[in-house]
């Protein structure tokens, strides 16, 4: 087996010395978060550990097939754990209320691939060169020699596939295809995953798409595309925030667009922004960092206080500056 970072051995030893474990993930979980949380939880349960899996928010409907028993649950106060493992969360703040509910623990392990990770654990395995946290969990299970069952393979394939944009994003490396191939060979149901994740969505999402195509805006010689989502928009669509994952890709795909942005109003004076870049010269992680957020060079976000139009002006100005600097 190829050499691996020593931190992995320390993580495996920490897990082996723990009996009670809580696996947690970031708020508004995406496919990488859901797949990583579930895949690791299932593997640890197979090893005889007493494991719970917590997330502040419900998982998006399209990932329900991965969790038919409802393993991922809302956090509960007053619990104590030998070990807490955070997956795909760049900071403790990204854990939301879960972070406060897991304060009574002996060890915090942080496994993530975000460039902006704050190294908030006692043991931190952060590899920004990996396109997904799911790939890190796969490596962990392989090195620990913990069995990868068909169900775990489904979870990890979903994690890897979704965070690489179905293996289309520039972060995808040759090794990613090898990981995906091994997961399929271990039983990942490719047809089922593709049908559930990519080939079907609820009517409420179709209504949101209609809203987006009717209201998106282009600026800066059509290099910037953006749209707003307000609570009233979600209510009219019969939708909620769980239906918003991936909506930004529809405006990102417009040919002249270099940077796409979604403004989602969470409260009257709190806006969540999501940024996507198609150019290696425009690092949206750096843009998001200006507003207290972070992520990856090609995909990042932040939560920004302030009046909506003020937030929009500041963010669009920062994007324009980045585009102008890129030439």
Predicted segments, located by residue:
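Glycine-rich, phosphate-binding/catalytic loops in enzymes
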Residues: 40-41, 101-104, 126-127, 178
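Hydrophobic helix-and-loop "lid/oligomerization" segment in the mid-to-C-terminal part
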Residues: 2-27, 33-64, 80-81, 162-327
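Structural recognition of alpha->loop->beta junctions
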Residues: 65-71, 129, 142
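Generic enzyme active-site microenvironment
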Residues: 24, 28, 86, 110-111, ...
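Short alpha-helices
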Residues: 111-179
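Active-site cofactor/cluster-binding pocket
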Residues: 67-123
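Solvent-exposed alpha-helices and their adjacent loops that cap or buttress functional pockets
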Residues: 15, 76-79, 100-103, 117-118, ...
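Conserved beta-strand scaffold positions in the cores of enzyme catalytic domains, especially
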Residues: 108-110, 124-125, 224-226, 262
């Amino acid at each position: 087996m190829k050499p691996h970072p020593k931190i992995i051995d320390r993580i495996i030893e920490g897990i082996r010395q723990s009996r009670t474990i809580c696996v947690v993930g970031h708020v508004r979980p995406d496919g990488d978060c859901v797949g990583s949380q579930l895949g690791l939880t299932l593997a640890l349960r197979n090893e005889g550990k007493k494991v719970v899996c917590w997330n502040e928010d419900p998982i998006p409907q399209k990932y329900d097939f991965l969790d038919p028993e409802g393993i991922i649950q809302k956090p509960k106060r007053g619990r104590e754990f030998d070990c807490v493992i955070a997956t795909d969360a760049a900071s403790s703040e990204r854990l939301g209320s879960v972070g406060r509910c897991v304060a009574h623990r002996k060890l915090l392990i942080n496994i993530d691939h975000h460039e902006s990770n704050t190294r908030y654990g006692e043991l931190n395995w952060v590899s920004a060169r990996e396109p997904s946290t799911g790939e890190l969990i796969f490596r962990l299970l392989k090195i620990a020699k913990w069995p990868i069952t068909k169900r775990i393979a489904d979870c990890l394939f979903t994690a890897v596939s979704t965070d690489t944009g179905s293996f289309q994003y520039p972060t995808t490396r040759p090794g990613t295809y090898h990981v995906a191939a091994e997961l399929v060979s271990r039983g990942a149901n490719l047809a089922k995953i593709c049908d559930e994740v990519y080939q079907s969505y609820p009517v409420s999402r179709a209504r949101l798409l209609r809203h987006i195509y009717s209201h998106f805006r282009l600026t800066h010689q059509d290099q910037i595309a953006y749209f707003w989502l307000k609570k009233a928009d979600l209510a009219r669509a019969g939708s909620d925030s769980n239906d918003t994952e991936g909506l930004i890709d529809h405006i990102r795909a417009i040919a002249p667009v270099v940077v796409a942005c979604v403004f989602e109003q969470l409260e009257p004076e709190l806006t969540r922004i999501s940024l996507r870049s198609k150019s290696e010269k425009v690092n949206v992680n750096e843009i998001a960092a200006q507003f207290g957020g972070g992520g990856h060079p090609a995909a990042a976000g932040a939560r920004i206080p302030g009046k909506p139009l003020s937030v929009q002006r500041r963010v669009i100005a920062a994007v324009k500056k980045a585009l102008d600097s890129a030439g």
